[in-house]
Amino acid sequence: MGIGRFAFTPILPLMIQEGTVHLAQTAWLSSSNYIGYLVGALSLLKNNRHPLFVVLGLTLVTLTTWLASLSSFDWLLVLRFLAGVASAWVLVSISAFAINWLKSRQVATSGLIYTGVGIGITLTGLICSYFIFQSATVNVAAQSLSSPLSSRLWQYLGVIALLATLVVTFLLAKINSQFASTAAATTAAAKAHPSKAAHTKASHTNPTASITPAKLKLANVLTAYGLFGFGYILPATFLPQIAKQWLSGQSYLLIWPFFGLAAALSVVLSQDLQRRFDNVSLLGVWRVSQIIMAVGTLLPALWQSLAGLMLSALMVGGTFMVVTMAGLQVAASQVTHYPKYNLSALMTASFAFGQLIGPLTALVATGKNIWLALLPVSAIVLLIGVALLWRPYQHQQSSNHV
């Protein structure tokens, strides 16, 4: 997913430089991807076939990544849409499947699955940065004899995605077989002791009177998660392009690998907090992380230097997967009255709607320094989301930890 969802970001400055796409078209390509992400999430609202959609999503990621090397702008719109659908299938399905499977094995570090996205971002960033840097030392005549570098990068990443998909498919089939055996044993035990099973079910069923408060909580959580999608998406999509505009030489190539590394390590750090401090709540982690993200989003508008952009990459990259993880787990722990919906899909759909609006704001602004106006707006939206999280829960303490 780190490839299919985010490879576009480090390749984008190169595609603009080569003339494959123009700056004005990038918002359309981004929006196409985010529409696909929304459609993919909505398509899974009532789906429970998680392993199937993980494999389908990864397969589609592989195809769309490789085919991007051959495509014109019109076809890129279609491919970015399909890549968005595939990414939503992967995130929703692996979140629902893997967390449940790990919990069934009493593994306390289920959130570590989210390091995968950061690792994928880091990998794509390093590969793209290496080849872009190397191409700067090749003479123009030699470059003219080969295909555009952006096309070759899409092909390289497509091959990596294919290899990873084959490995994941094999491992997922093995894990799913073990999970099915465990579920069958649990069902057999429940049939053997029906009174105990009925008592357990009743003890976890809330009274009808509590349904209305739960709906209010769901509305606040969904809205806050959607605002997170809007707020984070501009730096997460355009930070390397911003860096290329404002920095000299090849130093902008450092930004995206650093962003991905921060994303991967931040999830590990949040898991470590659980082991060290029992009073660290999921909701608290969400709030604090989103405040840090807001500051990191605003930073490039105030500090246009390598240090400022690196710090922004650290603050946004180091929080967005933590917020993703915490948001999905807060929703699952706070809302228990919607069994007919896949809650991960519902949350992801809200997020997708928010991130869809983000790039569209870039369409109404023009010029090299449009980010000076747009990034503060994103930061304000993130803080509004934090305010929504504070009010409904200010008298409530969560017992769930990251």
Question: At which residue positions do the language-model features occur?
Answer:
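Cytoplasmic helix-loop-helix junction between adjacent transmembrane helices
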Residues: 81-116
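Extracytoplasmic gate region of multi-pass secondary transporters
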Residues: 9, 217-257
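Helix-loop-helix hairpin linking two adjacent transmembrane segments in secondary transporters
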Residues: 73, 109-176
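C-terminal transmembrane helical hairpin of 12-TM major facilitator-type secondary transporters
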Residues: 281-327
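Paired small-residue
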Residues: 74-83, 307-315
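Helix-to-loop junctions at the C-terminal end of transmembrane segments
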Residues: 39-51, 266-281, 366
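A late C-terminal transmembrane helix in Major Facilitator Superfamily
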Residues: 335-369
